[in-house]
Regions:
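N-terminal catalytic scaffold of extracellular/periplasmic and nuclease hydrolases
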Residues: 1-176
Length: 177
């Protein structure tokens, strides 16, 4: 589902080190052209240019020439291709019958790591949802929010989506701030 191209030294150089934190930073919809334009216009170096490990990826929807954020996010988070609007689900499961593909946040959680999804979007937006939920349609905010609360992810932080409330968060053992 995803092609990743390292742009700096390999992560293999760090295998013997005790790595405590990993941040998977996504500039949703951003390309190298946006970064270069920013550097040229402002005459600055970007902090992300100093990161020890960097990479890029090209994601493709299975059903459309243009990939939406749900299919792209699923490719990044689960390593599979799906249909546009599908969030962390298999292509041949439009009725949501089968087990879902595991996303990287769930994999880390299951390996006793602290996990979080932080976004400037709504918490149920397509890209953050791909790392924290599974839904047959990206616009099913209620289903996505419930799945996020059931996920046991340590932190979900973003803008209000009109679904999550303090009471709902408390019911699932979360603190709503």
């Amino acid at each position: 589902g995803t092609y990743i191209e390292p742009t700096t030294k390999s992560a293999d150089n760090y295998l013997d080190e005790n790595i405590e934190n990993v941040i998977f930073l996504i500039g949703d919809g951003m390309g190298y052209n946006h970064l270069e334009k920013t550097k040229l216009e402002r005459n600055i170096e970007l902090t992300l240019d100093t990161f020890a490990i960097q990479g890029s990826s090209r994601t493709r929807s299975l059903t459309n020439d243009v990939t939406d954020s749900a299919a792209g996010g699923t490719a990044l988070s689960c390593g599979i291709r799906t249909y546009n609007s599908g969030v962390g689900v298999y292509l041949l499961d439009p009725l949501d019958v089968f087990i879902h593909p595991v996303n990287i946040t769930e994999l880390c959680r299951d390996n006793k790591m602290l996990t979080g999804v932080i976004t400037t979007d709504e918490t149920s937006g397509a890209t953050p949802s791909a790392f924290s939920a599974h839904a047959t349609e990206r616009y099913k905010s209620e289903d996505i929010t419930e799945d996020q609360f059931n996920s046991n992810i340590n932190l979900i932080w973003g803008t209000e989506n009109g679904v999550a409330t303090k009471e709902m968060a408390a019911e699932y053992g979360y603190k709503y701030v």
